[in-house]
A protein has these predicted regions:
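Membrane-embedded beta-barrel scaffold of Gram-negative outer-membrane proteins
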Residues: 363-367, 373-377, 570-624, 629, ...
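Short, acidic, small-residue-rich periplasmic hinge/interaction motif at the N-terminus
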Residues: 31-34, 41-46, 75-80, 89-132, ...
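Face-selective signature of the C-terminal outer-membrane beta-barrel domain
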Residues: 292-308, 337-514, 597-600, 648
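Short acidic/polar hinge/loop motifs at secondary-structure boundaries
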Residues: 61-63, 177-205
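Gram-negative outer-membrane beta-barrel transporters
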Residues: 489-491, 495, 601-604, 623-704
Length: 794
């Protein structure tokens, strides 16, 4: 019996040793075609039921059974799946795997190639160059089509995010905050934005709950990184709305990109109801030089010069508005002209040093922004407002508008940044010192004469309907600092764990102009559960401030009919508490990849500075007088609606309220619903023909008569409805030719802007009769226009 037990024990021992000998360890790293590690790529052996995910550095480690052949599959959304066959593996095996980009997602890739962990989504606009565009600002037009974002003018690159104003959106280029012009009051004047889409490499955009490294704005953060090309490249494009050229040069240690853009929307403005001589000319040049004298040193320089001229001599205008049963006609004959100038200089210089451990980097950045702005016009008009059916005169008179607005602004900054990476943490901090100098000298007035009487009519004195004077200087110094950590950790089963990404940080700022110091703690958590790798939950909260700048400071007081604008030193930062919960689900339908995102948010607003909006001009009350809220839900479906092309559909529902002087009213940017659709398609059987369709349908904004209290908001404008379609033909494709050429692609395009010719309302002109009765005459946006374009890529 003892002998039998001994045999059994020895047999079990040899069996266990044999089983142990049949296992092996597989380890390695997964990276993209450029050698960058791919996080959360799946490494699976389906025959053995084994699955692990790569870590932050793209590394993996898995224990497997040794067989004659072991089939290992490497997969990640946005990349081509790769399979490796291991023959009789033993001991420890190491694999270095590179995944190629998935060409089936080569159209406009809106989401990043990895699941979105934080509140910042990664956008790619390089293929938007073939989409129809009225502004030529591809990045901003891409932003305007995202969930929670809206615009009400195709002439403007500005956008509202979840009930916020244009001024509540921060923009960064290579870690330096940039600014928009101060005096711009209409989309016609805007010209080109500071972001050159040809030079953009990465775009990060957050609609709320963003990280502590992004500045003191309440609504959104746009983070732009300019490209460092790996080889010489370039393009030249031209259309009826302007032209652009881009050249990128690359050597072993140096890259140099240059972009030149010219825009004239004279052709587009010809479809407006106000006829006259439009002479808009916008010119922009940018350069980005990056030099690596050693592997651990990098020196960067960005320079920008922008010159925007807007000259206009109106002649006449006729507008018909109202209902089918009650049609009114508004006719004006003009004298005078407008002449505006916006000249901007911007530059940054950065030195970055990586320590020997290659995990820590230190950067010193300096920047300078300078703008010179002039807005000058003297325009007189004789108008008639009549009832069309009865020819009854509802208002007859003359008005004269005068403006001499001059502004100079200079902002200089120096910033020290520190970044430290480990396997699970990415710690980042910075300190910034800014010097702000702004000088304004403005004089505006508007005079109206209705049926021989000056408006407003008192029977005694002569008054202007509006008169404003401002002579102000701002000398401010601002200190900003932040510290944040991005922590990756996991729990549960080692082979298929639940993945977490926690971002937490705090931001501090002090401004000597009003003596205010603000602290802004922020945090977000992303969870990818073990039971479904295609599902991600995100939660974010934080205290956000809108630090006042020049426009918010302008407080007004009226003496003897003249409004004086002065700077309010007692104003405080507006405040918003964000609470966000979202879900992202990645799936396949019809054997094509899709992604559905749903996000709910609530923003508690306090210490608000009320403002009114006319076209794109935001005029503030100059004091913290209100509180309120903004809440809603944003839905987005992204994927291949048609094989080989990416499209997306967004739906946003929102409710905003502001309590002002004891009365609850909607915010001036209250938009109860918005639908955006971007669709890309190819002709069957060929990639030479491409079609892009952009659709926007958004609720109208609340309006009230000018120079009246904001709480007397009287009505809501009609919904904004617009469809643009573009057809592109690839005349030349170098990849299809055996004999190579300097050109990679040549595209010919034809766009139809405002396909259905819908008359959208941008703002209102208010006609007042002698009885002080006011009539709102709509100012319509552009009509249907055809645009031709050509693009050479090399």
């Amino acid at each position: 019996m003892k002998t039998f037990r001994l045999y059994i024990t020895l047999a079990l021992l040899f069996l266990s040793l044999g089983m142990k000998a049949q296992t092996f360890t597989l380890q390695g790293k997964v990276s993209d075609k450029d050698g960058h590690p791919i996080e959360l790529a799946s490494v699976s052996v389906l025959d053995q039921g084994k699955l692990v995910m790569t870590n932050l550095h793209g590394e993996f480690h898995i224990e497997l059974q040794s067989e004659d052949s072991v089939k290992v599959v490497f997969a990640m959304v946005g990349y081509r799946t790769k399979t490796r066959i291991l023959r009789h593996p033993r001991g420890k095996q190491t694999l270095q795997v590179q995944l190629a980009d998935d060409n089936m997602l080569n159209e406009v890739v809106v989401e990043g190639k990895t699941p979105q962990h934080g509140t910042t989504q990664q956008l790619d606009v390089k293929d938007m160059k073939t989409a129809p565009s009225a502004t030529g600002n591809a990045v901003e037009e891409m932003i305007q089509s995202q969930a929670g974002v809206s615009t009400h003018s195709e002439l403007s690159s500005q956008y509202n995010v979840r009930g916020g104003s244009f001024d509540e959106n921060s923009v960064y280029i290579n870690n330096v905050e940039v600014y928009r012009p101060f005096l711009v009051r209409s989309g016609q004047q805007e010209g080109l934005s500071i972001i050159n889409p040809d030079m953009v490499d990465k775009v990060g955009f957050a609609t709320g709950g963003f990280e502590a490294k992004y500045g003191d704005k309440m609504s959104s953060a746009l983070d732009i990184t300019y490209k460092r090309p790996k080889h010489t490249e370039g393009n030249i494009s031209a259309s009826l709305l302007g032209a652009s050229g881009y050249l990128g040069i690359a050597t072993k240690n140096l890259t140099w990109t240059n972009g030149l853009r010219y825009k004239t929307n004279r052709y587009l403005l010809g479809s407006l109801e106000t006829e006259g001589e439009y002479k808009p000319n916008f010119l922009d040049y940018q350069t980005y030089l990056s030099w690596k004298p050693k592997s651990n040193w990098q020196i960067d320089f960005i320079g920008n010069i922008s010159e925007n001229h807007y000259n206009f001599e109106p002649e006449d205008r006729e507008t018909r508005f109202g209902t089918m049963e009650n049609v009114k006609s508004f006719r004006v004959y003009f004298d005078g002209k407008e002449k505006d100038l916006f000249r901007t200089y911007f530059g940054t210089f950065a030195i970055t040093h990586k320590l020997k451990n290659n995990k820590t980097s230190i950067s010193l950045l300096g920047s300078a922004f300078s703008t010179r702005e002039q807005e000058r016009y003297d325009i007189q008009g004789q108008y008639w407002l009549t009832q069309t059916e009865t020819s009854e005169n509802l208002g007859v008179g003359t008005y004269m508008e005068h403006s001499r607005d001059y502004l100079k602004a200079n902002v200089k900054s120096v910033k020290l940044m520190l970044n430290h990476r480990t396997a699970k943490h990415n710690i980042e901090g910075a300190v910034t010192y800014k010097i702000e100098r702004i000088k304004e000298n403005s004089a505006e007035y508007e005079y109206r004469d209705s049926a021989g009487y000056s408006v407003p009519h008192t029977g005694k004195d002569l008054y202007m309907i509006y008169s404003m004077r401002a002579n102000n200087e701002l000398h401010g110094n601002r200190v900003e600092a932040y510290l944040q950590d991005n922590w990756h950790f996991r729990s549960g089963n080692d082979s298929v764990p639940t993945l977490y990404t926690l971002n937490y940080g705090v931001r501090f700022a002090h401004w000597n102009f009003n003596g205010e110091s603000i602290f802004s703690p922020r945090a977000s958590l992303s969870i990818t559960p073990s039971f479904n790798r295609n599902l991600t939950f995100r939660f974010a909260t934080g205290l956000y401030y809108q630090a006042p700048f020049y426009k918010e400071l302008r407080d007004t007081s009226t003496v003897n009919g003249i409004t004086y604008a002065t700077l309010n030193k007692d104003i405080k930062s507006q405040r918003s508490i964000h609470a966000i919960a979202s879900m992202e689900y990645r799936f396949e339908m019809m054997n094509r990849p899709f992604k559905f995102t749903a996000e709910m948010y609530y923003k508690a607003l306090s210490r608000l500075v009320p403002y009114s909006v006319n076209n794109v001009k935001v005029v503030y009350y100059g004091d913290n007088e209100a509180s309120g809220h903004a809440m809603g839900i944003d839905l987005k479906l992204f994927g291949e609606f048609v094989p080989g092309s990416d499209s997306w559909l967004t739906l946003s529902l929102m409710d905003t309220k502001m309590k002002l002087n004891g009365k609850s009213i909607p915010l001036p940017t209250d938009q109860r619903y918005a639908v955006n659709f971007f669709f890309t398609d190819y002709f069957p059987g060929t990639t030479r023909w491409k079609m892009n369709l952009k659709l926007a349908y958004a609720d109208g904004l609340p309006f009230s008569a000018p120079h009246r209290e904001l709480e007397n908001s009287s009505f809501r404008a009609p919904a904004y409805k617009r469809v643009d379609i573009g057809m592109s033909y690839r005349l030349y494709d170098n990849n299809e030719r055996t004999k190579k050429s300097i050109f990679k692609n040549i595209w010919l395009g034809l766009d139809c802007l405002n396909l259905f010719g819908i008359s959208n309302v941008n703002s209102y002109y208010w006609v007042t009769d002698v009885t002080n009765q006011q009539y709102a005459v709509p100012n319509y946006l552009t009509g249907r226009q055809i645009n031709g374009r050509v693009l050479f890529e090399f």
